Amino acid sequence: MAQLTCQKLCVGYDGKPVLQDLDFEVFAGDYLCIVGENGSGKSTLMKTILGLQMPISGRILTGDGLRKNEIGYLPQQTVVQKDFPASVREIVLSGCQGHCGSRPFYSKEEKKLAADAMEKMQITLLAKRCYRTLSGGQQQRVLLSRALCATQKMLLLDEPVSGLDPKVTAEMYALIQKLNYEDGITVVMISHDLSAALQYASHILHIGDTVFFGTKAAYLNEFPQAWQKGGEVK
């Protein structure tokens, strides 16, 4: 059974669709990269999957034991978020809020979950640092740690390497790949870098003028020019 299924999905704003009749499934352990032109609806799709906005039509179903509150989310950062005056530990712990319910404190288990997430992202030594004093790459590791506190099943990542230099980008991709391969966490990632998507993903969802969903091998078979032209498909 698929963890996530989208059936005849139509998403947009104010009743105006930006993406229509979308069908795809994501299974446990998949690494799906969502690619496409600017304005094609990638971030809108992700927000709709998360329930942050309603679909215009169609269905979004979860299965295989996955509940919507067990999906970790790493959004695109805003300038305000980058200047957030909280400690690294406080931000990572906030990812456990979905487990707390009405309880106004974090349990011992939740604190351990946060500590384990920071260790995986190699930021344990930054726990007491103020978030806004960190580099862009360190901030993204903090936000990924927070997302891990929400789930051990599925991560939704919206441009997780945006604005990072090549070295830090490669390190971030390696950490995400490790979570997928070693921990078995399903990854759904939006990326403008199709060459990276083709390196790491098991499946590709291309939206825009061209709509495609399938395995990486099937994508390369249908669009062989994607690799040759650095991932550009119209």
Feature names for model-found ranges:
Residues 130-134, 138:
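Conserved ABC ATPase signature
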Residues 108-126:
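Conserved ABC ATPase "signature" region
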Residues 203-216:
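H-loop (His-switch) and adjacent beta-strand-loop-beta switch element
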Residues 155-158:
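Catalytic Walker B motif of ABC-type/P-loop ATPase nucleotide-binding domains
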Residues 166-168:
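Helix N-cap at the start of a conserved alpha-helix in ABC-type nucleotide-binding domains
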Residues 191-192:
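H-loop/switch region of ABC-family ATPase nucleotide-binding domains
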Residues 35-37:
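The feature captures the beta-strand-to-loop junction immediately N-terminal to the Walker
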